[in-house]
C-alpha cells in the first residue's frame, strides 16, 4: 500500500527502508529531513510496503521492495511520473532507460589532485540561479525544482556547492554535494562549459570537493552512466554497485 509519509511511525519506516543503502540514504535522507512535514514541498515522500518512495515532478526514486508492482505502477502513472530510479529490477514490461553506476570515496580516503588549472579561482558560494540556468535553460520546470530544492538544502546544511571561475569572473565549472545525510554526501551536476572540456578542470574540481568531504568524515557517492565510468575510475573513485532508471510501461488502448 502506498502511504504518504506524515506520522512519526511512517517517518521511522521510511528511514528504516533507506538505512545503509548508498545513494538512497543520502538523497532520500535529505528529503525526509526537509520535506516530510511540508505539504508544499517539491518532493513528496511515501512508504510502499517496506520500501521508500520519493516523487519530484516527473521522476521518482524507489529504495527497497514495493511488494505489489502493479499498485506502484498505477500510483506512479496517476501522479505523472515518467522515470523511476531504483535498486530493484522491476517485473517484465518496465523499460530500462539507462544503467546508473554507483561510485564512491570512503570517509578518510584521499584522491590524487592535479594542479588547479591556471587562471581559475574556487568559488565556495556560487549562485544557484546561475547554475540552474546553465544546467536547465531548456527545461523551465526542472529549473524551478532544482532551484527551490537546492536553496532549501543549502540553507539547512544538507548540501554544498562549489564552482570555478575564470579571470573575468565567469563560472566555467561546477559540482555539488546536493544531498548530505546519514553520513553520506551524494555528488551530482558536475559540469564544465563545453568549450573548456578536456582541460582537466572537472578533474581538479570533483576530487577537490570529494577529498574535502571525505576528510570531514563523509562517505562520498555519485551515480554515472557507462560513458563516464572511465573518467571517474581514472580519478580514483571506486565502483560500488549498479542501479537502473526505468520508463513507465506503455499501456494498450
Named regions from a protein language model:
Residues 1-28, 99-102, 107-147, 165:
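Short amphipathic alpha-helix that is part of the acyltransferase structural core
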Residues 96-108, 238-253:
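Conserved catalytic-core motifs of GNAT/GCN5-like acyltransferases
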Residues 1-92, 141:
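N-terminal charged segments
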Residues 40, 142-191:
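A conserved beta-strand-loop-helix scaffold within acyl/acetyltransferase catalytic domains
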